[in-house]
């Protein structure tokens, strides 16, 4: 069965353009505002959406996404409510792929079989669980794949030729290439180095490769997208939320428009990249 993720990247390849993958934190700064942002992303130009599951100890995330997670948790966001958000989104949109991104602990506490069943029923298409290595595939990856959920793995600049086959073995949907060593939203990736890394990964897989971590501006997104099948932007969108909050950390009338406006700028830049010309 073709997942929404595979279908979307097939469409993008046929159009000869890279995709824009956007990340938001579920429940940031509150459930209703986050749902409004989620619903506005496709029209603004997001091709694939990652929804972050808030967690108290997000080791791979930088200050922006850590703060967003804490805002969401303070507002009462849970894994169950995150699935509710996706379900509500699916009431209006049945085509845009949604990937849940987070850490294993909340899923483990929720219960793996229950989580897989509920995620599938809610309309989730894929999972990125950053702290589950390939050696733990039996925990979540293989059951998720059996249920028809794509399991997306991270490859990094330190993933060498010996390690890469293990990383790719059960990866489905796309490969997420982490363009920098470190946490999200920190350094700025080098477009030429990224293009070389993507080419190296593609020697081992036919899956599309999306690149994230450190991509903040439309110009950076376009430069990275020229050498990849997709570019992921997260910290910049989360920061757009933060900058519009009032002194109590609550959403304002500017919160949703600020995020969708930035996504429109990013999408315009990424859609201006012609993959055929770049290759």
Curated annotation (Swiss-Prot):
Matches recorded under SUPFAM superfamilies: Ribulose-phoshate binding barrel
Active site residues per record: 50 (proton acceptor), 61 (proton acceptor)
Top-level EC class as recorded in UniProt: lyase
Assigned GO CC terms: cytosol
Record text on subunit structure and interactions: Tetramer of two alpha and two beta chains.
Alphabetical list of Pfam families matching this protein: Trp_syntA
Tagged with keyword Transferase: no
The entry's keywords: Amino-acid biosynthesis, Aromatic amino acid biosynthesis, Lyase, Tryptophan biosynthesis
UniProt-listed Enzyme Commission number(s): 4.2.1.20
Classification via Gene3D superfamilies: Aldolase class I (3.20.20.70)
GO molecular-function terms, A-Z: tryptophan synthase activity
Family: Belongs to the TrpA family.
Origin species: Azorhizobium caulinodans (strain ATCC 43989 / DSM 5975 / JCM 20966 / LMG 6465 / NBRC 14845 / NCIMB 13405 / ORS 571)
Name under which the protein is recorded: Tryptophan synthase alpha chain
Pathway listed: Amino-acid biosynthesis; L-tryptophan biosynthesis; L-tryptophan from chorismate: step 5/5
Catalytic activity: (1S,2R)-1-C-(indol-3-yl)glycerol 3-phosphate + L-serine = D-glyceraldehyde 3-phosphate + L-tryptophan + H2O
Function text: The alpha subunit is responsible for the aldol cleavage of indoleglycerol phosphate to indole and glyceraldehyde 3-phosphate.
């Amino acid at each position: 069965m073709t997942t929404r993720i595979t279908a979307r990247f097939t469409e993008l390849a046929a159009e000869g353009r890279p995709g824009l993958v956007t990340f938001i934190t579920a429940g940031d700064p509150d459930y209703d505002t986050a749902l409004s942002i989620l619903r506005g992303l496709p029209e603004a130009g997001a091709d694939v959406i990652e929804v972050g599951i808030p967690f108290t100890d997000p080791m791979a995330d930088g200050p922006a996404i850590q703060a967003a997670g804490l805002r969401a948790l303070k507002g009462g966001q849970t894994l169950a409510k995150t699935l509710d958000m996706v379900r509500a989104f699916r009431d209006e949109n049945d085509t845009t792929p949604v990937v849940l991104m987070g850490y294993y602990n909340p899923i483990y506490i929720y219960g793996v079989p229950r989580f897989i069943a509920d995620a599938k029923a809610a309309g989730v298409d894929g999972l990125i669980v950053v702290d589950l290595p390939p050696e733990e595939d039996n925990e979540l990856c293989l059951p998720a794949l059996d249920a028809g959920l794509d399991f997306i793995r991270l490859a990094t600049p330190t993933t060498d030729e010996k390690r890469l086959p293990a990383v790719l073995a059960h990866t489905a949907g796309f490969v997420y290439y982490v363009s920098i060593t470190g946490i999200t939203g920190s350094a700025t990736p080098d477009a030429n180095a990224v293009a070389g890394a993507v080419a190296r990964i593609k020697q081992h897989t036919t899956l599309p490769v999306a690149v994230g971590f450190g991509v903040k501006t439309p110009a950076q997104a376009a430069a990275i997208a020229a050498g990849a099948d997709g570019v992921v932007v997260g910290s910049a969108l989360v920061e757009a939320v933060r900058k519009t909050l009032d002194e109590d950390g609550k959403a304002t009338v500017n919160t949703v428009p600020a995020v969708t406006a930035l996504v429109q700028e990013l999408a315009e830049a990424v859609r201006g990249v012609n993959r055929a010309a770049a290759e």
